[in-house]
Regions:
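Short beta-strand-centered aromatic/proline hotspots
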Residues: 73-74, 109-116
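Short strand-loop-strand
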Residues: 57-98, 125-129
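N-terminal helix initiation/capping motif
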Residues: 1-78, 133-157
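Short, conserved beta-turn/loop elements at beta-strand boundaries and strand-helix junctions
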Residues: 80, 117-122
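Short structured motifs
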Residues: 46, 95-99, 111-113
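C-terminal structural segments of small proteins and small subunits
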Residues: 120-140
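Short, charged beta-turn/beta-strand-edge "cap" motif at the junction between a beta-strand
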Residues: 102-107
């Protein structure tokens, strides 16, 4: 899935930024991911905007969280450098937000900074640049509760 690929890339990039360094296989993976998102000859607008990576069209539901923001948004484009959200609240240029994308038993958390904003009817279309290292939370089901002494004492009371 696209979200997992972006998560892998941002994690490896974050590892570099922390000064930990990468193993040879991780360096190869970063190179592979960067080449897969390299602009094509048809992506003329990228050179004008200064974007380094191509964004892929997608249809994901996410939650945007920030200062007085906790809204459901639609992620319509995503790439290693950033993403575009539709049905978004107002996000000023430079404002930091968190994008939470749920995928079955995983919850991806990306930090992003507002870059541009366009009026989209009642809501906005927002361009965000990804920053920092993302987090992936694994959801696990706890086993069924087994009655014990505490439960027996509570029932007797």
């Amino acid at each position: 899935m696209l979200v997992d690929i972006i998560f892998q890339y941002r994690s490896l990039l974050g590892k570099c930024e922390l000064g930990v360094g990468l193993e040879w296989d991780e360096i190869e993976r970063v190179t592979e991911l960067e080449s897969s998102f390299a602009p094509t000859k048809d992506d003329r607008r990228m050179s004008a905007s200064g974007r380094r990576y191509r964004r892929e069209a997608t249809k994901l539901s996410a939650v945007m969280r920030g200062d007085r923001i906790n809204d459901r948004v639609d992620v319509i484009e995503m790439g290693p450098g950033g993403l575009v959200c539709r049905n978004a609240p107002y996000v000023s240029r430079g404002e930091q937000v968190e994008i939470v994308i749920e995928d079955e038993n995983l919850s991806y958390r990306f930090r992003a900074v507002g870059v541009w904003l366009k009026d989209d009817g009642e809501d906005f279309r927002v361009g965000l640049a990804l920053v920092g290292m993302p987090v992936c939370l694994h959801k696990v089901a706890i086993s069924a509760h087994e009655a014990d002494v505490v439960d027996q004492l509570a029932a007797a009371a």
